[in-house]
Amino acid sequence: MKENTKWILYNLTVVFALYWTGNLLLWFPWSINANLGIGLMLTIMPFLWGFGIFHCLIRYKGEKVLTGVIINSIIMLVIAVVSDYIFFGLIRGAMDDLYQPATFYGYVFLTIMTFLELLILKKLILKKRCPLTAKSFISFGAIGLLSLLILIAIIKFDIKI
């Protein structure tokens, strides 16, 4: 498999893991109070996304890191929009909850965040570059799948704190 294809698949895996892990972390606070959930989303999620962006960018093997940033940003936005539809529309049946101002703010911020991370951490990203390994895929993939399954169980069985 070509290195770029592996890197794109890695990005998809990381974004999948971050999205579902983030929703799992926010589920209970959000179910108690929407404003609490939104507040936590706007404070905790940037750190989680930043962690994932960093892991994607240090594994980018292209000459121009900016190209990797653009690709990563597009992947993150597309997966977030599709995953939001799956989570709010298909799993929860709550499309009205999806289209809130905070959602669109989140999409814009997520798109810009990759560029901000490159601007702030470019030297560190270039210094920490490392190859993609099967372990990289497995760890993020397992976390994402486990988070998704737990979240589905919580919602379908109406588990409360």
Where does each model-flagged region fall?
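Membrane-interface helix-boundary motifs at transmembrane edges
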Residues: M1-E3, A34, I58-G68, I125-K135
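Hydrophobic cores of alpha-helical transmembrane segments in multi-pass inner/ER membrane proteins
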Residues: M45-H55, G106-L121
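Alpha-helical transmembrane segments
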Residues: K6-N23, T111, G141-I150
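C-terminal halves and exits of single transmembrane alpha-helices
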Residues: I75-L98, M113
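Loop-to-helix transition at the N-terminal end of transmembrane alpha-helices
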Residues: S31-F51, V69
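Transmembrane alpha-helical segments of multi-pass membrane proteins
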Residues: G68-D84, S136-L145
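Juxtamembrane boundary at the C-terminal end of a transmembrane helix
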Residues: I150-I161
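Membrane-helix boundary connector in multi-pass membrane proteins
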Residues: G89-Y99, L118-K135
